[in-house]
């Protein structure tokens, strides 16, 4: 008899993962199905973000998972990708949230922060006790972040920040803000990163209402009006724009695994539908055109997985 086709892994990409990576994938899938899936429709409809989930993400080791210290799981890049892949099968909002926390908040503090900053912030971000966001994009500075208008001015104790950031994931619920700013002359090479804390005088957020998608994930604006911070809040080890792009590259890596998870889920829903929908006394799946579409989509998904997996291996060898 013909061997049963594994629709989801025709090129054995997932089968050739390490045992640890397979176990992580299974655990995250079980968690997603048990905890996220039952409430996802309601939470999406009512824009409800469950803050307690962050503690569960932390306990499972999903936050900052590739770090080797501060209580992080210390897993491979592919394992981090698989976390995004399985979470986004249920909802993109949860994956966005984990991506921002891991790649755009934990990563810059770990890579560019002082030892004191790492001790102060990383354990609580990794455990999910604190939530972070990443303030780069502005209403006039999206694809070209160097045209930002947010500024810092040095004073005796540190810096004064002024400006606003827009469309920021996690902003309305964040405890920790990674903010990028230029000097008052807006010189491109003056870029600096800062860590701001919720409740700092002059720092506020607003929520973007009535979004049409990613409704579980709060998105908002960050407003800074003469925010005075100590010099110990500056990420002193940033190396210009390359530091920002290292954060974005990490985030894009997680997103690329995530969208393949979403695509796999959509594919499965479509497959179940065409197998069960009877038309002219036979299932839709009996039509070759439908079969070809399913095969083509699965091929594209697996080409994506192959590329993501190769990228993961390169990242683990520091071939960024």
Description of each model-found segment:
Residues 128-136:
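A short, Trp-centered hydrophobic/proline-enriched beta-strand micro-motif
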Residues 162-205:
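A short core secondary-structure module
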Residues 37-45, 271, 275-285, 298-320:
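C-terminal helix-coil-helix/basic helical segment that borders enzyme active sites and/or dimer interfaces
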Residues 150-153:
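A structural signal for short hydrophobic beta-strand segments in well-ordered beta-sheet cores
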Residues 13-17, 23-24, 183, 204-303:
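Glycine-rich beta->alpha junctions and the first turn(s) of the following alpha-helix
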Residues 59-129, 169-176, 315-318:
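Internal helix-loop-helix
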């Amino acid at each position: 008899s013909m061997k049963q086709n594994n629709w989801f892994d025709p090129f054995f990409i997932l089968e050739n993962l390490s045992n640890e990576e397979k176990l992580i994938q299974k655990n995250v899938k079980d968690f997603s199905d048990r905890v996220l899936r039952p409430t996802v429709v309601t939470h999406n409809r009512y824009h409800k973000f469950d803050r307690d989930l962050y503690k569960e993400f932390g306990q499972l080791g999903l936050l900052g998972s590739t770090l080797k210290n501060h209580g992080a799981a210390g897993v491979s890049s592919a394992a981090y990708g698989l976390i995004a892949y399985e979470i986004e099968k249920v909802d993109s909002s949860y994956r966005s949230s984990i991506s921002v926390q891991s790649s755009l908040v934990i990563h810059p503090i770990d890579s560019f922060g002082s030892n004191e900053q790492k001790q102060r912030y990383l354990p609580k971000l990794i455990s999910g006790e604190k939530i972070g966001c990443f303030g780069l994009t502005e209403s006039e500075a999206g694809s070209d972040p160097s045209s930002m208008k947010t500024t810092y001015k040095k004073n005796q104790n540190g810096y004064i920040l002024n400006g606003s950031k827009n469309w920021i994931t996690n902003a309305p619920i964040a405890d920790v803000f990674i903010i990028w700013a230029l000097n008052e002359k807006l010189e491109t090479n003056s870029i600096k990163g800062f860590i701001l804390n919720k409740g700092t005088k002059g720092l506020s957020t607003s929520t973007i209402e009535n979004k049409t998608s990613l409704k579980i994930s709060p998105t908002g604006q960050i407003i800074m009006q003469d925010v005075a911070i100590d010099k110990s809040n500056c990420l002193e080890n940033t190396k210009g724009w390359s530091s920002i792009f290292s954060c974005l590259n990490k985030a894009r890596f997680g997103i690329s695994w995530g969208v393949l998870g979403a695509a796999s889920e959509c594919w499965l829903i479509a497959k179940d539908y065409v197998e069960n929908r009877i038309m002219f006394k036979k299932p839709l799946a009996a039509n070759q055109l439908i079969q070809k579409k399913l095969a083509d989509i699965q091929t594209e998904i697996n080409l994506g997985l192959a590329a993501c997996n190769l990228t993961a291996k390169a990242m683990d060898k520091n071939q960024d």
